[in-house]
């Protein structure tokens, strides 16, 4: 228990404690209010930072949205650029298609150029005349301008000479003036120097006198010294003046030289200014043209830039409007946020007031709570700062991406412009290439036309030369034929001599025939020995082939020979003199055939030498000539064998069968030669240009030759049947014309079947028709006439043509008519040989190589010659055969006039275009 005296102390202590507690409570409230203010300020700062972060976040979101929109625009721009690229590629493909169409059009134009050749030739002649006239006019103008130029040059030279004379006079005058002035100055200087020297001498004398009087006159010595000093000073002044005058003299010389040089420079400058004025005039003219072009280009560029600027400004206005709308929305959202924050602030103040009332009751818990909240806020601030740094980095990256996208967009725009420029340049390049190709094609066609015209003129000249040579040879052959006919006529008029006399006569004829040819034929014989060897080798090959290939009507001929009896014994017993005459005639025909074969080779050799094609392709030409030679030998051999058959006594149906078999064999040999040549061409391919030139026409020529050979076979069979009609036959013999006709029909069918594959293969094999061109030289006038008539008909009519059926044989007549038929057949064989010679010597059988150009008809002399021979060889009782031959020759003579009607004008072919 406390004492009573301690109560006031306790009360005082309580009062002190209450006051302390109140002071502590007031201090604590002050501290809490300060802390509350601090927390409020920190909260406001945090809220401000939060608002800034929210605004930054919203701004970043807007930036991202704008970037997405820009990316979408970029994607659309890239898609549009891709579409433009695809459109450009489509345009390029269309341009390629148009280029192909242009090539086709060029090909068509080339074909039209071929059709308009004659018009072009006329136009060329007119243009040539106009060019000559213009050339003469321009030459007159050039002469006039040359005279004007010479006059101007002469006047300028005269003016230059006058200026040179004036300059020389001025130079001489200046030099004279300068020399006179120099002489005056030198004279003056010399006078002054003399005066100075005189004064110097006088002063020296005075000095000497003064020196002499020095001892006596000391007072005068000082004066003399002073006068000496003055004299030295004057002397120095005079020397300085002399030096200055010398400098002036040098200056005058330099001035005169400078004046002369200035005058020369002025003259040179006048010339240079005249040249410069001319150059400046030209340059100004060029600069005006260039400035005009640059002005147009600048106007176009400024227009394009103005359009682009307008587009950019429109896009900028749209972007600014969108930005203003976004800013207004942000402002409204900020006002809403500010109202929300004010409400939240009032609520927070009320809450803080309630918290302040509760803090007084639980200070420790509040301190702990505040510390925890401070720590959490610090952590939040730190996280917000980190997020702010991240957002700033993201914003920087987005800005970099935006810059990169802008650069890519600018590069894409530049690429687009470059692509447009490349497209325009490509169009111009294509146009230029098309123009160049068209110009080159026109130049090539013109060069081809010129080359063809030159080649045509050269070939015409060479053909004229060969025709002259052939005419000379024909004159020689006419002389030989006339001599032979006269000799035979004389022998027949005086009677046939004995065999010994015949042998002597034949030897004499051989000597005459050897000595008679002219020196030209002898020279040609010496040149063609190598060709004869080749022809002999080919003849051997043809004989081997003829032995290998069986004739189609051999069985019929053998049956005919078996059914017919051998009339040789009876014939020898009946007419021995006539048989001897026939044998002698056969021997002479053999010898004559050899000479004619040599003449034919001599005729073919200059044609081969004069051919322009032999230089470009010698190997192919040699092979075709040897092949043609073999065909000639085969055909000539066939004619000789036919002549032998006609010369014998059994010259009736056996001779006709042999002739038909020989002609059928010749057709088979022709087909075989064509196939062999095709195989050879397959083994040795030619150049494409030569193949294009020669393939179509040579194949058509071979087909034409085959058809004409068939027609000749049919005509010869018909001719033989007519001859058999007029001839006499024994009663016991039977002639089988039906078998010959059947065999002939089979031969025609077989050759027609061979024609189809050969025609198909002829499209791919060149030079196969050169055999036909050589065989054309071996056919008779009837074949030539048939070629003229067939060229005007269609190929279908040629293939549908067939020989007429043979006529029935008549009853046999007397024995004399049989001898008449055999002799007429022999004369027909001789006529065939002469026709072969005439056709071989004519240029139409060798030079007929074009498709549309028909062959030239045989000369009328070639048709009249066999009639003379027939009249010379036939006996007086041969009117029927002679009339038949005369009709045949008359018909062949009238054919050239008909053939002229169906001839077409020659057409120059463009070998640059593929068929």
UniProtKB/Swiss-Prot annotation:
Compartments it resides in: Cytoplasm, Cytoskeleton, Microtubule organizing center, Centrosome; Cytoplasm, Cytoskeleton, Microtubule organizing center, Centrosome, Centriolar satellite; Cytoplasm, Cytoskeleton, Microtubule organizing center, Centrosome, Centriole; Cytoplasm, Cytoskeleton, Spindle
Region (Centrosomal targeting domain): 1-502
Coiled coil: 92-173, 214-422, 456-483, 521-548
InterPro entries hit by this protein: CCDC57
Region of interest (Microtubule binding domain), residue spans: 606-915
Comp. bias regions, Basic and acidic residues: 745-758
GO cellular component, as recorded: centriolar satellite; centriole; centrosome; cytoplasm; spindle microtubule
Predominant subcellular localization, coarse grouping: cytoplasm
Leader sequence segment: none
Residue ranges of the region described as Disordered: 555-574, 606-653, 724-915
Low complexity bias locations: 628-652, 879-891
Bias kind Polar residues: ranges: 613-627, 781-794, 819-830, 841-852
Name of the protein: Coiled-coil domain-containing protein 57
UniProt source species: Homo sapiens
Upper taxonomic lineage: Eukaryota, Metazoa, Chordata, Craniata, Vertebrata
